[in-house]
């Protein structure tokens, strides 16, 4: 049986061994606590068809839970909007917030397995930073992850992936993600 106590995710070990030193050298940080690190990864699925069929949110939450390895939380409408036929507290999507080892494991699977399986993939956009060191991207189909069985998927759903870092600028965050081998186009 595998001993779980000594296990460290691959990207977490890489951060401790090589990424921190490279970032400190590149940006000239005086203190180790200034070095940017990953804070959390938020996965979000908005289910537009949930207005007509609320069961679709449940299946989306199950798929997101399989992808993340953690139970997804169903998100609800804050207020009613008649034009969209949305009522207050109606389930509209689901989300998962990953931290710690699960965050590093997910990022590893995203970079090495899921992104190369995206159709016509050349890389991710390098300009999707928010100005405060957080990176946002979207996937159009959930079955690029190996946890999702293609035959059991009823409907193709996309997802938003937000990678939050402690970096102060976009350049620092981009350098951090490049150290983790994130395939940026520019």
Swiss-Prot record:
One of its GO terms (molecular function) is rRNA binding. GO terms for cellular component: ribonucleoprotein complex; ribosome. It holds the Pfam family Ribosomal_L5. The gene is rplE. It comes from the Bacteria. This is Large ribosomal subunit protein uL5. The lineage of its organism: Bacteria, Pseudomonadati, Pseudomonadota, Alphaproteobacteria, Rhodobacterales. NCBIfam families: PRK00010.1. Belongs to the universal ribosomal protein uL5 family. The keyword Metal-binding does not apply. The keyword Transferase does not apply. One of its GO terms (biological process) is translation. Keywords: Ribonucleoprotein, Ribosomal protein, RNA-binding, rRNA-binding, tRNA-binding. PANTHER family: 60S RIBOSOMAL PROTEIN L11-RELATED (PTHR11994). This is one of the proteins that bind and probably mediate the attachment of the 5S RNA into the large ribosomal subunit, where it forms part of the central protuberance. In the 70S ribosome it contacts protein S13 of the 30S subunit (bridge B1b), connecting the 2 subunits; this bridge is implicated in subunit movement. Contacts the P site tRNA; the 5S rRNA and some of its associated proteins might help stabilize positioning of ribosome-bound tRNAs. Part of the 50S ribosomal subunit; part of the 5S rRNA/L5/L18/L25 subcomplex. Contacts the 5S rRNA and the P site tRNA. Forms a bridge to the 30S subunit in the 70S ribosome.
């Amino acid at each position: 049986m595998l001993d779980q106590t000594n296990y460290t995710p691959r990207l977490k070990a890489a951060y401790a061994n090589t990424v921190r030193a490279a970032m400190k050298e590149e940006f000239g940080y005086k203190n180790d606590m200034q070095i940017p690190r990953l804070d959390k990864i938020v996965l979000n699925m908005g289910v537009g068809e949930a207005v007509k069929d609320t069961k679709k949110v449940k299946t989306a939450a199950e798929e997101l839970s399989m992808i993340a390895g953690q139970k997804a939380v169903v998100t609800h409408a804050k207020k009613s909007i008649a034009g969209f036929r949305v009522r207050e507290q109606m389930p509209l999507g689901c989300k998962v917030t990953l931290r710690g080892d699960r965050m590093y494991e997910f990022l590893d699977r995203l970079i090495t397995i899921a992104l190369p399986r995206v159709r016509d993939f050349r890389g991710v956009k390098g300009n999707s930073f928010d100005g405060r060191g957080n990176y946002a991207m979207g996937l159009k189909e959930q079955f690029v992850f190996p946890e999702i069985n293609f035959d059991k998927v009823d409907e193709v759903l996309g997802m938003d992936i937000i990678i939050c870092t402690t970096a102060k600028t976009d350049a620092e965050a981009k350098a951090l993600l490049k150290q983790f081998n994130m395939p940026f186009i520019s």
